[in-house]
């Protein structure tokens, strides 16, 4: 049956040829033929098995039939080789190579492996195939010399030993000292076969000990040869350790005599260096010492570091100001002048050095000279020095120097023969001859005239003193010449009694000297006094030389020039005054004021000055002067008759009188009319009282200069009263501003809540503070020779102008702000109200506040340039009428006050007719009063 189905299969799928073949075979089988005898019955790689009925083919081991049947027949089926190497279980094992061959596989080991079964083993052969690693390193010579063999699975590797590098197939020695940084700093590298070693350089040692080492992590440390061997350089040298070596040097201040090789012991000697060639600063001396030096500042200098001896070259020697260290170094009546490295002592004017003392010995003393000589006058005047230098030959100086030399001749006769009697008569005659030629002096310049006048006055004074001091001159004398009259008196027993005065007269002039002045003058020996009166001297040393030449005064000399002197060292600052009574050359006019002036040689070359003397009394024929020193004196008449100033005086006088009347009426109004009394009228009252007192004192006391003490007191009160006026003006301005500002909120003056006591403390207290401070700082600032006011020649006037300028600025700002707020308020009210006739009145009141609050004082600042005259008239007119403005605004233009005036005049008392206050604001009354 099997054959039939096979035949059937092939019949359907094969070709006709194969069908015919199958039929033939089948026929043979049916005939009992052994098909296996035919070698072509089965395909290649198959075995044929004959059966009773047929046969079958079976593929050999390692092959598989193409039809997938284990037993098959007939051609068409092929036995295909099985690739055993593709099996997942790796038939040959690890580390092997499987090679497929027909019907089987051949196993061989990979390179580097071997098997006990041989190099090639057929799969299926007897035994077991296993590849194991071959250790190539066991083979001698497999790696080159100086290398190491490293076996690995299936292979090996050769690496050069440490210290060797590969060069192709050989290992050569590596020079580590060349190829890499093998040793640390300060070490030397030494190459060896296959290695290296390091050694520290000379003078250094390995930190780990030992002579040799390897590795950069090690270090070479310096060997301190100096500490290991203290005698290395010798006893007189200093051993200095260096890196890897040492050196020998001399101590500071010494030098080596020979060159020293570093790292070798010292050879030679150390010799001292003289550093003092140019090492100390200027103004110092250098002192060389063994191995060193030090600097010392010269006497009169001190080192900047405070040390007496120093070596620091940054230190300097600075001059010592001995005069500052000890202000009394030169003693009394002397001046100390610092000079580099020292100081100079000199005596004050009118003093001379005591010959028994010296600056060098520290006992420099000055004694008042009894009288001045030529050397005391020359240093004070440049003109005199020119004459002494021979420039008098110049035509411009000939006449002047002739007078100077003639005066010095008189002085030389007095000074050069101090022990010989002095002829006062002869000196007076010579001076008279010079005064006789006084008309020639008008050819001299102002400086030359004052210089010549000074030396002539000093010469006469010295001559009078010399006559009193010389033994033969101890007798009272009266010398009369045409141009000079002298009376001298020696005091014997006249001063034995207390309160006695010595009276001296000359040409109608008189000097009264109290005996207490004789005692205070510290006279030695028999004391004496002298008095002189010069004729014609007043014509040359006239009012042109007045120190305070005010443009507002006409000045004229109206007395002879007189002078007084007293023996003794002290001639000024006496406890009680010396009284001079000088006769007028012309009668004194009522409009004139007498000024006692003394000749001051410290101002330029000489000037008349009122300081030191006071006018005690002035009549038509005489003026009495009180001076605190012996001086040269004269009387200058001052009068204010210039047109412009006189007209301003009249305006000021009339305006002040009008203001006083108005202020008196305003004060009476605020005090007597109870209906108008309120917080505002109290403020007006205080301002009116201060202005009234200030103006009446100004009117009656500004020119009371006869008594300087009383004049200073008047000036102090004026200072206080005018300051109080301005402080109350400030209070008025602030209160007015607060009232207007509060109109925006409610028609009520909330500033009423400010207590009047506080306002009084401000208005009266602050001026007191200013005056006290001013008087303490500058007590001589009150009172001048021509008016009882603050001294305008110094900055003392700013004790008044400073506060005034500040208050004017504040008041002006507050008033501007007030007017701006008021304008807004008026614009916001009913238009009918704004058209009332009161608008013009309110505008007038607003403008008037400028004058009431003192803002017009700013006009005084603009009294300069071409507008000075206009500003002066405006300033004088407006400010003199300040009281009138106050009365006009606060009284006459106030309806309530006018009603009170009307009641007073008509004696009607209608208490029900009270109206509200006038002038919305600027009358300084409550807010909504009416005006009419």
Swiss-Prot record:
This is Adhesion G protein-coupled receptor E2. Residues 16-652, 703-719, 778-795, 871-872 are extracellular. Residues 482-643 form the GAIN-B domain. Pfam families: 7tm_2 (PF00002), EGF_CA (PF07645), GAIN (PF16489), GPS (PF01825). Its main location: membrane. Belongs to the G-protein coupled receptor 2 family. Adhesion G-protein coupled receptor (ADGR) subfamily. It is a multi-pass membrane protein. The lineage of its organism: Eukaryota, Metazoa, Chordata, Craniata, Vertebrata. Residues 596-643 are annotated as: GPS. InterPro entries: EGF-like_Ca-bd_dom, EGF-like_dom, EGF-type_Asp/Asn_hydroxyl_site, EGF_Ca-bd_CS, GAIN_B, GAIN_dom_N, GAIN_dom_sf, GPCR_2-like_7TM. Orphan receptor involved in cell adhesion and probably in cell-cell interactions involved specifically cells of the immune system. May play a role in regulatory T-cells (Treg) development. It comes from Rattus norvegicus (Rat). Coiled coil: none annotated.
């Amino acid at each position: 049956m099997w054959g039939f189905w096979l035949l059937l299969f092939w019949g359907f799928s094969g070709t006709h040829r194969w069908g015919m073949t199958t039929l033939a075979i089948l026929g043979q089988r049916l005939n009992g033929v052994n098909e296996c005898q035919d070698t072509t019955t089965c395909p290649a790689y198959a075995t044929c098995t004959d059966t009773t009925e047929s046969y079958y083919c079976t593929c050999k081991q390692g092959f598989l039939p193409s039809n997938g049947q284990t037993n098959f027949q007939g051609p068409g089926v092929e036995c295909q080789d099985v690739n055993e190497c593709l099996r997942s279980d790796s038939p040959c094992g690890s580390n092997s190579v499987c090679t497929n061959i027909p019907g089987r596989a051949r196993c061989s080991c990979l390179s580097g492996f071997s098997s006990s079964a041989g190099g090639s083993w057929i799969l299926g052969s007897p035994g077991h195939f296993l590849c194991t690693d071959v250790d190539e390193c066991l083979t001698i010579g497999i790696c080159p010399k100086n290398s190491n063999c490293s076996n690995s699975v299936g292979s090996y590797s050769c690496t050069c030993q440490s210290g060797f590098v590969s060069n192709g197939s050989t290992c050569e020695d590596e020079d580590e000292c060349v190829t890499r940084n093998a040793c640390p700093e300060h070490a030397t590298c030494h190459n060896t076969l296959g290695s290296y070693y390091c050694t520290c350089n000379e003078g250094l040692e390995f930190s780990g000990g030992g002579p040799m080492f390897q590795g950069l992590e090690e270090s070479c440390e310096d060997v301190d040869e100096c500490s290991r061997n203290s005698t290395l350089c010798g006893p007189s040298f200093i051993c200095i350790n260096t890196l890897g070596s040492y050196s020998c040097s001399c101590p500071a201040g010494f030098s080596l005599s020979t060159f020293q090789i570093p790292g070798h012991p010292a050879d030679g000697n150390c010799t001292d260096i003289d550093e003092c060639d140019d090492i100390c600063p200027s103004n110092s001396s250098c002192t060389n010492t063994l191995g060193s030096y030090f600097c010392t500042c010269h006497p009169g200098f001190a080192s900047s570091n405070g040390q007496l001896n120093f070596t620091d070259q940054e230190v300097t020697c600075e001059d010592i100001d001995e005069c500052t260290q000890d202000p009394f170094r030169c003693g009394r009546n002397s001046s100390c002048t610092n000079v580099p490295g020292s100081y100079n002592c000199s005596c004050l004017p009118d003093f001379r050095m005591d010959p028994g003392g010296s600056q060098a010995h520290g006992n420099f003393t000055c004694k008042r000279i009894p009288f001045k000589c030529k050397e005391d006058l020359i240093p004070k005047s440049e003109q005199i020095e020119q004459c002494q230098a021979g420039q008098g030959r110049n035509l411009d100086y000939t006449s002047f120097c002739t007078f100077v030399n003639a005066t010095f001749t008189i002085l030389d006769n007095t000074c050069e023969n101090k022990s010989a009697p002095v002829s006062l008569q002869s000196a007076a005659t010579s001076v008279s001859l010079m005064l006789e030629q006084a008309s020639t002096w008008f050819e001299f310049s102002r400086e030359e005239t004052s210089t010549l006048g000074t030396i002539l006055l000093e010469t006469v004074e010295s001559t009078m003193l010399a006559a009193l001091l010389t033994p033969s001159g101890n007798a009272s004398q009266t010398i009369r010449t045409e141009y000079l009259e002298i009376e001298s008196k020696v005091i014997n027993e006249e001063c034995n009694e207390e309160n006695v005065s010595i009276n001296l007269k000359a040409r109608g002039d008189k000097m009264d000297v109290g005996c207490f002045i004789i005692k205070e003058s510290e006279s030695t020996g028999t004391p004496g006094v002298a008095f002189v009166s010069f004729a014609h001297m007043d014509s040359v040393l006239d009012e042109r030389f007045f120190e305070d030449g005010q443009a507002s005064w006409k000045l004229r000399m109206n007395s002879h020039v007189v002078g007084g002197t007293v023996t003794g060292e002290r001639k000024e600052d006496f406890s009680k005054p010396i009284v001079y009574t000088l006769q007028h050359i012309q009668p004194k006019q009522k409009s004139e004021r007498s000024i006692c002036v003394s000749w001051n040689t410290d101002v330029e070359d000489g000037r008349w000055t009122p300081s030191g003397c006071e006018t005690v009394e002035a009549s038509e024929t005489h003026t009495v002067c009180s001076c605190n020193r012996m001086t040269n004196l004269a009387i200058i008449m001052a009068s204010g008759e210039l047109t412009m100033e006189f007209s301003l005086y009249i305006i000021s006088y009339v305006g002040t009188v009008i203001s006083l009347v108005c202020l008196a009426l305003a004060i009476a109004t605020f005090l007597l009319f109870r209906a108008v009394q309120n917080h505002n009228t109290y403020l007006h009252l205080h301002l009116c009282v201060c202005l009234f007192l200030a103006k009446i004192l100004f009117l009656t006391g500004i020119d009371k200069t006869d008594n300087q003490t009383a004049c200073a007191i008047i000036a102090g009160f004026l200072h206080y009263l005018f300051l109080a006026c301005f402080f109350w003006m400030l209070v008025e301005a602030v209160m007015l501003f607060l009232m207007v500002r509060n109109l925006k909120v409610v028609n009520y003056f909330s500033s009423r809540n400010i207590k009047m006591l506080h306002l009084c403390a401000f208005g009266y207290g602050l001026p007191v503070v200013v005056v006290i401070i001013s008087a303490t700082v500058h007590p001589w600032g009150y009172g001048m020779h021509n008016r009882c006011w603050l001294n305008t020649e110094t900055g003392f006037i700013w004790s008044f102008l400073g506060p005034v300028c500040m208050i004017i600025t504040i008041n002006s700002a507050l008033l501007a702000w007030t007017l701006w707020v008021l304008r807004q308020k008026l614009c916001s009210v009913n238009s009918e109200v704004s058209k009332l006739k009161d608008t013009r009145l309110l505008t007038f009141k607003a403008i008037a506040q400028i004058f009431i609050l003192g803002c017009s004082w700013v006009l005084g600042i603009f009294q300069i340039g071409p507008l000075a005259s206009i500003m002066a008239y405006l300033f004088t007119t407006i400010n003199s009428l300040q009281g009138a403005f106050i009365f006009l605004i606060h009284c006459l233009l106030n309806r309530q006050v006018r009603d009170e005036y009307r009641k007073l005049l008509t004696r009607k008392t209608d208490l029900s007719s009270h109206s509200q206050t006038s002038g919305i604001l600027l009358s300084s009354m409550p807010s909504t009063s009416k005006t009419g």
